[in-house]
């Protein structure tokens, strides 16, 4: 992932798109983004976060200042070679342009190195099978009695749609990590 992220950032910086940076790599598991399910099949998720807008209207926006909740948002850093301007005219079209450009840069890199990308996918898949045979965790437990069972059903059904084996405990489960009631997934 850093290979793609760094290439995309370098290309977009080269195109003169201020405010592009790569930072805060993720561990590929978040129940908040359905796209993370791609990692269950060793796929590669591309996620672009862009500066939002209140609507489709172009407006003058102030990027967080040096003293704001995220200090130095406009400073030059190793991962942010072309920082955003302190104030910008911004619209939803800018969001679309930035995200589309990132995707197209990633596709360009893939088309330039298809064998490398395919080999990396194969190795990642092979390594995940081997580590799944010998390294914990071998599974996860979603304890029964969750406050919102519809969310549990959503996660479980999404995992099943991905071809991931999900079982339901018919009786209490006792593990080193704790005891889980019948009905746990």
Language model regions located:
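Intrinsic-disorder/low-complexity accessory segments
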Residues: 1-30, 34-185
